[in-house]
Amino acid sequence: MTDQVNRPKGVTSVALIAHDNKKADLIAWVEKNSVKLNKCTVYATGTTGKLIAEKTGVDVKRCHSGPLGGDQQIGALISEGKVDLLIFFWDPLEPMPHDPDIKALLRLATLWNVPSACNSATADFLVNSNLFEEFLPQRPDFDSYLSRDVPGN
């Protein structure tokens, strides 16, 4: 099913995203988990990353703001194998103008087998799991998909 990625064990990169009404929750979660996160490359969308860096001291590689393409940039990092874990505190009570981007991001995380959390409880399970230190990404093998016969060609 998958190819194991040849690299050291453990989560080495985390992407952090939060909608406006969830930014305070994510910042609190990052403060609580800063020791582990400081051992990782941390990516974040623009405003979220700025606030995390200012309020927690965690070093963040910032993408654009989510609605300006940041969700898509994180998705690209996922497809390139540069993100091991996605923490995305999204607001289920607010419609977002960039909902298609959000759906695409979550689709890529699922497609590329990237563990994901949408709230602090699930995020806690992921970072406190023994697998956090032992994690080896397993990327799906899409060879059969890429070599399939396409009708009309």
Swiss-Prot record:
Coiled coil: none annotated. Belongs to the methylglyoxal synthase family. Keywords: Lyase. Catalyzes the formation of methylglyoxal from dihydroxyacetone phosphate. GO terms for biological process: methylglyoxal biosynthetic process. This is Methylglyoxal synthase. One of its GO terms (molecular function) is methylglyoxal synthase activity. It comes from Hahella chejuensis (strain KCTC 2396). NCBIfam families: MGSA, PRK05234.1. The active site is at D71 (proton donor/acceptor). GO terms for cellular component: cytosol. Residues 3-153 form the MGS-like domain. Substrate binds at H19, K23, T45, G46, T47, T48, S65, G66, H98. It catalyses: dihydroxyacetone phosphate = methylglyoxal + phosphate.
